[in-house]
Design a protein with these regions (language model features):
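Conserved SAM/AdoMet-binding glycine-rich loop
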Residues: 105-110, 117-119, 222-345, 356
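Short flexible coil/turn linkers enriched for glycine and charged/polar residues
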Residues: 176-179, 189-191, 288, 298, ...
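Hydrophobic, well-ordered secondary-structure elements that form the walls
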Residues: 294, 335, 355, 363, ...
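Radical SAM enzyme [4Fe-4S]-AdoMet core and its adjacent flexible, acidic
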Residues: 43, 239-256, 260, 307-310, ...
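Terminal RNA-binding accessory module
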Residues: 1, 6, 378-467
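Short, hinge-like loop/turn segments at secondary-structure boundaries
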Residues: 126-128, 150-153, 246-248, 282-283, ...
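Proteins enriched for Cys/Gly/acidic motifs involved in redox and nucleic-acid/cofactor modification
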Residues: 1-238, 277, 292, 314-325, ...
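Glycine-centered loop/turn positions within well-structured domains
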Residues: 141, 191, 236, 301-302, ...
Length: 467
């Protein structure tokens, strides 16, 4: 039986809001406006969490700045998904000792998935004495209280309760865009893929109530947001813990029926929980972007079993082919791991053949990175690093060729795009399927839906002109 999520009481959230007011008054009594910098590593869920951290900081009187130099408060939101991300965090946190030497009253906090690992917290505690506070993803809603305690006492604080499994509604948000918005619909993961640290640091799956999600989305539409992405470690499991009879496809449909001009997206999905009902829902509603990120990770059944993915190559292909059958324009993207422990050359060839069969629009490709505490980290891994790099290059070459061929097929066609910014002399936009389009135009077009005729392409983007 699914555990129901624990919703943080409004009284507790009101207390945190009051603390924000107290911090703001404390800074006002000192006669100046403090500044805060938030640095984010990792996935879109971390981006959404950082928006809430910025919201709490602004409610506490801080101006949000884009550099750590001179900031009164620095928050680093960390990622634990791969070793490279952790190495970068350690390096950058270490460098902050010099920044703090120039600004002794500066307060430095670390949060995010790395702080859900006890060995990491111990390392920070013992080797990074200039760090003032640590909190894991479950304690994010308590950040104002933690900040106030550090400001008042000057003592370090480590809030890493792992009993977790909560939902906190109504936390203030400072969004990074006034056009595109992240909306977290659930947190955590129950899948325990053998290589993945996420369930250990984010906790078990817990879903927000549909009425709370709809309330947030309605507010975004009213504020003029035109590209809304629903977030979860596995959105296809949405609602199982609520017992309301509302699944992810139902939630998507209820949002897609709201008035307004916007595109609705989602990530990430797990193939074992993806359904034809979800594909049918995407096909039915014009506001739902015809884009599906469906990670396959490997094209070989033995490797998939070792990964604890709970589906086969054939089951995955049936889903992918069904999506393309009912939506020929469906943009399919995916994640794939190269060099999983014990992967043979023949098993790697199965991955290449799956890529050729599905013909993904884009892939996010990774070489296996062992994560301490996961089953895969203990598996025998005889494949040399050089061989893994060679396979990685072959896979990237295969996908780059396919991506270019797909893009070449768009030359001469007219596509609907949402203009989202500028890079040097060109405007940038995204198609319904998430493809990057560059074209000449005036900044007044930013934020608008337009029809653009495609005149050229590269492997990674399209070039067009407004007719």
């Amino acid at each position: 039986m699914e555990r129901k999520p624990v919703v943080i009481a409004q009284e507790e959230l009101a207390r945190e809001a009051a603390v924000c007011g107290e911090i703001k008054a404390w800074w006002a009594s000192r006669g100046r406006t403090p500044r805060a910098y938030v640095d984010t590593y990792g996935c879109q869920q971390n981006e959404a969490d950082s928006e809430r951290i910025r919201g709490m900081l602004r409610a506490s009187g801080y101006d949000i700045v884009d550099t750590e130099e001179g900031a009164d408060c620095i928050v680093i939101n960390t990622c634990a998904i791969r070793e490279h991300a952790e190495t970068r965090v350690y390096g950058n946190v270490g460098a902050l000792v010099h920044t703090k030497a120039r600004h002794p009253e500066q307060k430095i906090f670390l949060c995010g998935c790395m702080m859900g690992q006890p060995q990491v917290v111990e390392r920070i505690k013992n080797s990074y004495r200039h760090v003032d506070g640590v909190f894991n993803p479950h304690e994010l809603w308590r950040f104002p209280e933690l900040l106030q305690r550090v400001l008042k006492t000057g003592k370090r604080i480590f809030a890493v309760d792992d009993s977790a499994g909560n939902i906190a509604e109504g936390i203030p948000v400072v969004r990074s865009s006034n056009l595109k918005a992240w909306v977290s619909i659930m947190y955590g993961c129950n899948n325990f893929c053998s290589y993945c640290i996420v369930p250990y640091v984010r906790g078990r799956e817990r879903s927000r109530r549909p009425e709370e999600i709809l309330k947030e989305v309605k507010g975004l539409i009213a504020a003029g947001y035109k590209d809304i992405t629903l977030l979860g470690q596995n959105v296809n499991s949405y609602g199982k813990d609520l017992g309301l009879g509302v699944d992810f496809a139902d939630l998507m449909a209820s949002i897609a029926e709201l008035p307004g001009e916007f595109w609705l997206r989602f990530m990430t999905s797990h193939p074992k929980d993806a359904s034809k009902k979800l594909f049918d829902t995407i096909a039915r509603y014009p506001k739902i972007a015809k884009q599906f990120h469906l990670p396959f990770q490997s094209g070989n059944d033995r490797v998939l079993k070792a990964m604890n993915r709970h589906y086969t190559r054939e089951e995955y292909l049936k889903l992918a082919h069904y999506g393309r059958e009912i939506m020929p324009e469906l943009v399919l993207t995916s994640d794939v791991i190269v060099g999983f422990p014990g992967e043979t050359e023949e098993e790697f060839e199965d991955t290449l053949s799956l890529i050729e069969e599905v013909r993904y629009d884009a892939l996010f490709t990774f070489i296996f990175s062992p994560r301490a505490g996961t089953p895969a980290a203990k598996m025998d891994d005889p494949t040399p690093k050089e061989e893994k790099n060679r396979r990685f290059d072959r896979l990237c070459d295969t996908q780059n060729r396919i991506s270019l061929e797909i893009h070449q097929g768009y030359v001469g066609r007219t596509l609907r795009v949402l203009v989202d910014g500028r890079e040097k002399e060109m405007l940038t936009a995204r198609t319904e399927g998430g493809r990057l389009v560059r074209f000449a135009g005036d900044d007044s077009l930013i934020g608008q839906f337009l029809d653009v005729t495609i005149t050229g392409c590269t492997t990674w983007s399209l070039v067009g002109e407004v007719k």
